[in-house]
Amino acid sequence: MTFLVGENGSGKSTLLEGIAAGIGAVAAGAHDLSRDPSLRAAQTFASAFLFARRRHARTRLFLRAEDVFGFTNRIAATLQDLADDERELRETLPEGYGRQIATGAVAAQRGALTNSYGENPDGRSHGETFLALLRRRLVPNGLYLLDEPETPLSPSRVLALMALIHERAGQGCQFIIATHSPILMAYPGATILLAEAGRLTQAAWHDLEHVRVTRAFMADPHATLAKLLA
């Protein structure tokens, strides 16, 4: 379990994207990783590195919180296309075994997607969709690169995410996560790498600015706000 942390603009997301491109990770967004226009710079960045591995992860997935909307739209569009295809086959093919086979194949594809993502995959909240997607896509012995997964989640959902990650880590999964969440960073035994001034250094959770600022605010929000807004 490795966390990449740092201020906005520190380069942690760029590094994560470069790793994703370099290891040939699959993206869960609206585009494949190699065709995502927002990741062209990551492809160039990745070419400057030599990637080595001890073993080949069966699954390599890259997921940004903002990609979930595009992914669910893609699933919804695919479900609609399959429904249209099935209707067209019923209307154009003569009755018989051939039509039964053709429509059955399309219906099976649609049923598989529905079982995984529901009849209305974009009808859930962003946070619910994000967690449901992770539960479906995190399989044993995979390598997962998550960019700010806490973004659509309430604090209790962040804890649910941590529990899910812990469960999958016990199944041989490895995670590299770029985050601003002090809750996620507190995962026991995790390696925390701080991106600062163009360098990566290992850091302790209690020394991170994210933790110190949050702790100070929670200890006395009125005093903190009075000082800030004076």
Tell where the protein language model's regions lie, with residue ranges.
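Phosphate-coordinating catalytic segments in nucleotide- and nucleic-acid-processing enzymes
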Residues: 2, 13-144, 155, 203-230
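Residues at the beta-strand->loop junction immediately N-terminal to the Walker
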Residues: 4-6
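ATP-binding Walker
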Residues: 9-10
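Beta-strand elements within well-structured catalytic alpha/beta cores of enzymes
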Residues: 15, 176-177
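Walker B catalytic acidic pair
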Residues: 147-149
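C-terminal lobe/lid and adjacent interdomain/linker elements of RecA-like ASCE P-loop ATPase modules
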Residues: 156-174, 181-230
